Each structure stands twice: as C-alpha cells, then as structure tokens.
Amino acid sequence: MKVMGSLKSAKSRDRDCKIVRRKGRIYVINKKKPRFKARQGY
C-alpha cells in the first residue's frame, strides 16, 4: 500500500479504484488489482 499526500493520482491509476473513508483516514481500494491500494497520510 502506498502512502500518499494526495489521492488524486492514485484514483486515476485504474478505473476500478474507489475512494473510501475508514477511521478518519482516506483510502483508495481496488478489488480487482490490489496493488493499486493507497492511503492518504501527511
């Protein structure tokens, strides 16, 4: 999982990427290609 400052580029890497919010953090998840997972962290 990548930790990124902005998830805009992470969301556009694949069309199946979705943004979800869990426990106050923002994640990009992708069920078909899990290597595209990312989390926003400052």
From Swiss-Prot:
Keyword Protein biosynthesis found: no
Domain of life per record: Bacteria
InterPro entries: Ribosomal_bL36, Ribosomal_bL36_sp, Ribosomal_L36_bact
UniProt GO molecular function: structural constituent of ribosome
Example GO BP: translation
GO cellular component: ribonucleoprotein complex; ribosome
Signal peptide: none
Keyword Transferase: no
Record keywords, A-Z: Ribonucleoprotein, Ribosomal protein
Family the UniProt entry places it in: Belongs to the bacterial ribosomal protein bL36 family.
PANTHER family the record matches: 50S RIBOSOMAL PROTEIN L36 2, LARGE RIBOSOMAL SUBUNIT PROTEIN BL36B
Record-linked NCBIfam families: PRK00831.1 (NF002021), rpmJ_bact (TIGR01022)
Record protein name field: Large ribosomal subunit protein bL36
Organism: Anaplasma marginale (strain St. Maries)
Gene name tied to this protein: rpmJ
